[in-house]
C-alpha cells in the first residue's frame, strides 16, 4: 500500500484557493449581523433591540447607556421622537407591535445616567463657535462636545435653564431640570445674554476655526444662501446651520452637521466619507413561523411605570437570523454565526508563521451543505471550509494527523482491496456496479447479493468495481490525491468501455458525477425499474428515513427511496429536518476523524428526531447510528433480506473488504487470491479492541510491530 508523503512545513507554496474578494462576497451573504428592522428604520441607528433586551431584564441603566450613544439629550429626543421604528416591528404582522417610544421614555425616566469618563478624551485643537439657541444649536453643541471640540456657545438666554427652555419648551419641569444638569456638566463654554448683532457675531467668528449657527442667525450672515440639506452647510459663507423644524429633524441635522465639522477641520470635502446616514434597508431574515401575537401593555398619559415598561419590553422577539444554527451542531458548538466563523477561518489560512488556531474548527465541518438550504441566502459553510483545507494543504500548512487514518484507508481501498472486473462473458459492459468502500467494509454480503442480482436481471453486462470514489481525499482538501484517484478510476472505466456507473452510495454518486463527469445512477433507480428482489421485506414497525448528505438537492433519489420502502410495506414516520434539511450523521467531511466529540453530537442530533428504527441509504450513516445503540438498516439490507454485522471495528472493516474481494474473485471469476496468513495468532481483550478502535490502531499495525522482532 502506498503511504502518504507529507511535505516539509518549511516549504511554502503561495497558493490561495479562495481570494479575499470571493471570501468577502461569501461573508456578505450572512445576514446575522444585519440590523434588526426597528434599528434599520431609526435615522439615528439606535440599537432598539439591545435597549429592549436590557429593559426586559429591568436593567434601565444599561438600556439608557445605549440610548445615550445616539443623542446628548435623551429626554428631549424621546419626547419628540416620531418612532418610525414601531411600524417596522415584525410583531405588527401578528397583532400589536412593541410600543418602543413609550419604553424609551421609561428608560430615560427611570434609567440612571452613566458617569462621563475622561479617559482617552483628548480635546481637539480646532475651535468651534455656535451662535443662537433652539433645537439645532443645542443638539449640535452636544454632538461637538462628544467629539471633544472646544466649543463656545453665544446666546441671548440668561442661563442654562432658559437655553433648554428655548429649545424644548414642552418639557416637564422635572425633565427640563435633568437636561439642564446634563448640559451644565458638559465641557462647553457658554456666553449668556449676548446681543447677537452682526458686528458682535463677525468679531467672534474671527476667533474660531468653524462657525455654526441657528437658522435665524445664519440668515443674518448669509441671507442669499440656504444650507445644503445633506451636509448642513452654507458653503459660500462657510457656516454650518440647521433647520427649525421637529425634534427628530433637528437632532438628525445636528449629527450631520457634526460630521461636516469633522471633515472641514481636516480640509476634506464635506460631501465625502460620510458613510451611511439615516435610516437604512436591512437584509435581516427572521423566521416568524410558530410566533404568536400579543396585545401591547396599555399606557396611561403619564407613560409606563417601571414594571409596565419591563412587561412591554419582554414582548420583543429580539429579531435575528439563526436558521443555520438551529439545526447545525457545528455552528452551535462554536457559538459563531457563519459570517464570523468564515472570516476567522480565512484569516487562519493567511498565517505564514505562528499557530493556526482555526485548524480544528476548519476540519470539524462535515461539508454536508445543510446550511445552504436553511440559510435564506444560501450561505455555504462547506465551500468555505473545503477551500480553506485545500489552501492549507497547498501551502504546506495543514498537518496530516487529523485525516491521516481516513486517507490511508482510502489508499488501502484503492490498492490491496481494489477490484475491477467485467461480468464473466463480457469484455465491455453496459453498467458497472460501484457499491462504495463503506458498503464493502460494513455489509460485504449485501454487496455480493446486489451484484449477483444485477447480473441476473439487467442486460448488457454489469462490471464490478470495489474501491473508493475519492470523496475522502476531496473532503480532506488533498486535491492532488483526488486527481490520482480520478485518473485511476478513469483508466479502469475505459477498460470496461465507459459504462454507466450504478452507485450504491449517494456520496459516491455525487463525487463520481462531479469529479469524473461520468454517467451515474443509483442502484435504487435500477431496482425501481426492474422490480424488487424476491427476498425484499420491510420492517413490521414504523421506521424513520435519514436522508444522506450526498442526496441533498436530489429529489429523485429521495422520492425513489420512499417509493421502494412503500413497496416493501414499510410505514414511514415523518421527521423534522428530513430530505434537503437532513443533518449529517457525523461521518461526512471526515468530522469523525478530526473531531470525534463533534461527530458524536452530530449523530445524537440525527437520532433526536425519532425513536423509530432508522432506514438509511448511506452505509456510513447506518454504521454510526448502530454504534449509538439505535436499530438501523441500510435499504439494501431490507431489499436483499440480509442483516449485516452490527459494529465491525476498523480492523474488521479492512478484513471485510479483502475477504469480499477474495470471495468474489473465487466464486464469480474463478480466480484465487491468497490472503496473507500469519504463523501466529494474537488474542485481544474487548477493552483492547475498544481502545484500538478509539485510537485508530489496526490489528495489522500490531502485527507489523510483532513481525519486526
Language-model segments: what does each one mean?
Residues 649, 654-709:
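Ribonuclease/tRNase effector modules and their secretory precursors
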Residues 155, 215, 242-243, 330-332, ...:
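Active-site proximal loops enriched in glycine and acidic residues that flank catalytic Cys/His/Asp
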Residues 166-174, 438-524, 550-663:
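Cofactor-cradling patches in redox/metallo enzymes
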Residues 520-544:
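A conserved helix-loop-strand patch within extracytoplasmic ligand-binding domains
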Residues 1-120, 181, 188, 213-364:
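Ferredoxin-type iron-sulfur electron-transfer modules and their immediate structural context
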Residues 32, 120-123, 232, 425, ...:
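Short, flexible hinge/linker loops that cap or flank conserved catalytic cores
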Amino acid at each position: 500500500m502506498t503511504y502518504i508523503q507529507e511535505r516539509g512545513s518549511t516549504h511554502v507554496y503561495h497558493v490561495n484557493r479562495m481570494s479575499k474578494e470571493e471570501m468577502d462576497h461569501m461573508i456578505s451573504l450572512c445576514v446575522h449581523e444585519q440590523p434588526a428592522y426597528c434599528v434599520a428604520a431609526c435615522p439615528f441607528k439606535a440599537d432598539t433591540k439591545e435597549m429592549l433586551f436590557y429593559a426586559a431584564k429591568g436593567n434601565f441603566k444599561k438600556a439608557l447607556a445605549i440610548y445615550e450613544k445616539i443623542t446628548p439629550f435623551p429626554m428631549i429626543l424621546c419626547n419628540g421622537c416620531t418612532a418610525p421604528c414601531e411600524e417596522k416591528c415584525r410583531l405588527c404582522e401578528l397583532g400589536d407591535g412593541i410600543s418602543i417610544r413609550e419604553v424609551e421614555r421609561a428608560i430615560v425616566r427611570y434609567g440612571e445616567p452613566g458617569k462621563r469618563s475622561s479617559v482617552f478624551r483628548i480635546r481637539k485643537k480646532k475651535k468651534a463657535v455656535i451662535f443662537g439657541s433652539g433645537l439645532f444649536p443645542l443638539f449640535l453643541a452636544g454632538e461637538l462636545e462628544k467629539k471633544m471640540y472646544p466649543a463656545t456657545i453665544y446666546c441671548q438666554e440668561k442661563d442654562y435653564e432658559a437655553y433648554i427652555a428655548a429649545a424644548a419648551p414642552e418639557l416637564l419641569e422635572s425633565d427640563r431640570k435633568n437636561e439642564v444638569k446634563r448640559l451644565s456638566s458638559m465641557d462647553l463654554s457658554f456666553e449668556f445674554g449676548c446681543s447677537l448683532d452682526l458686528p458682535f457675531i463677525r468679531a467672534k467668528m474671527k476667533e474660531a476655526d468653524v462657525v455654526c449657527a441657528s437658522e435665524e442667525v445664519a440668515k443674518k450672515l448669509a441671507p442669499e444662501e440656504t444650507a445644503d440639506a445633506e451636509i448642513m452647510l452654507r458653503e459660500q459663507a462657510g457656516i454650518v446651520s440647521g433647520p427649525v423644524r421637529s425634534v427628530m429633524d433637528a437632532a438628525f441635522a445636528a449629527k450631520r452637521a457634526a460630521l461636516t465639522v469633522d471633515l472641514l477641520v481636516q480640509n476634506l470635502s464635506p460631501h465625502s466619507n460620510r458613510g451611511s446616514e439615516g435610516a437604512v434597508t436591512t437584509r435581516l431574515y427572521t423566521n416568524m413561523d410558530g410566533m404568536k401575537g400579543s396585545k401591547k401593555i396599555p399606557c396611561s398619559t403619564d407613560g409606563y411605570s417601571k414594571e409596565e415598561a419591563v412587561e412591554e419590553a419582554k414582548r420583543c422577539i429580539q429579531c435575528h437570523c439563526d436558521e443555520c444554527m438551529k439545526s447545525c451542531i457545528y455552528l452551535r458548538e462554536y457559538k459563531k454565526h457563519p459570517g464570523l466563523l468564515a472570516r476567522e477561518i480565512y484569516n487562519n489560512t493567511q498565517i505564514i508563521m505562528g499557530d493556526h488556531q482555526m485548524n480544528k474548527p476548519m476540519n470539524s465541518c462535515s461539508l454536508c451543505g445543510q446550511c445552504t438550504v436553511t440559510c435564506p441566502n444560501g450561505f455555504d459553510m462547506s465551500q468555505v471550509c473545503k477551500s480553506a483545507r485545500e489552501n492549507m494543504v497547498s501551502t504546506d500548512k495543514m498537518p496530516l494527523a487529523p485525516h491521516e487514518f481516513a486517507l490511508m484507508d482510502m489508499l488501502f481501498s484503492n490498492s490491496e482491496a481494489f477490484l475491477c472486473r467485467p461480468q464473466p462473458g463480457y469484455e465491455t459492459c453496459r453498467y458497472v456496479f460501484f457499491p462504495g468502500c463503506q458498503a464493502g467494509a460494513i455489509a460485504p454480503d449485501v454487496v455480493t447479493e446486489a451484484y449477483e442480482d444485477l447480473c441476473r436481471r439487467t442486460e448488457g453486462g454489469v462490471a464490478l468495481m470495489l474501491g473508493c470514489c475519492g470523496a475522502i481525499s476531496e473532503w480532506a482538501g488533498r486535491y492532488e490525491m483526488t486527481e490520482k484517484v480520478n485518473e485511476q478510476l478513469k483508466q479502469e472505466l475505459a477498460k470496461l468501455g465507459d459504462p454507466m456507473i450504478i452507485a450504491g452510495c449517494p456520496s459516491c454518486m455525487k463525487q463520481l458525477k462531479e469529479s469524473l463527469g461520468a454517467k451515474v445512477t443509483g442502484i435504487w433507480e435500477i431496482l425501481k425499474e426492474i422490480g424488487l428482489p424476491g427476498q425484499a421485506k420491510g420492517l413490521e414497525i414504523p421506521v424513520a428515513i435519514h436522508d444522506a448528505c450526498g442526496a441533498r438537492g436530489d429529489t429523485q433519489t429521495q422520492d425513489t427511496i420512499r417509493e421502494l420502502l412503500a413497496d416493501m410495506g414499510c410505514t414511514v414516520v415523518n421527521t423534522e429536518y428530513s430530505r434537503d434539511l437532513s443533518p449529517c450523521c457525523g461521518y461526512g467531511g471526515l468530522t469523525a476523524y478530526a473531531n470525534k466529540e463533534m461527530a458524536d453530537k452530530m449523530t445524537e442530533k440525527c437520532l433526536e428526531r425519532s425513536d423509530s428504527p432508522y432506514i438509511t441509504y448511506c452505509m456510513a450513516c447506518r454504521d454510526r447510528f448502530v454504534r449509538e445503540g439505535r436499530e438501523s438498516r441500510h435499504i439494501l439490507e431490507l431489499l436483499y433480506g440480509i442483516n449485516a454485522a452490527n459494529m465491525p471495528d476498523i480492523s474488521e472493516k479492512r478484513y471485510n473488504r479483502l475477504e469480499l474481494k477474495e470471495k468474489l474473485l473465487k466464486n464469480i471469476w474463478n480466480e484465487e487470491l491468497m490472503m496473507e496468513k500469519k504463523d501466529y495468532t494474537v488474542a485481544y481483550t474487548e477493552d483492547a479492541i475498544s481502545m484500538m478502535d478509539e485510537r485508530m490502531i489496526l490489528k495489522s499495525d500490531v502485527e507489523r510491530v510483532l513481525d519486526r522482532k
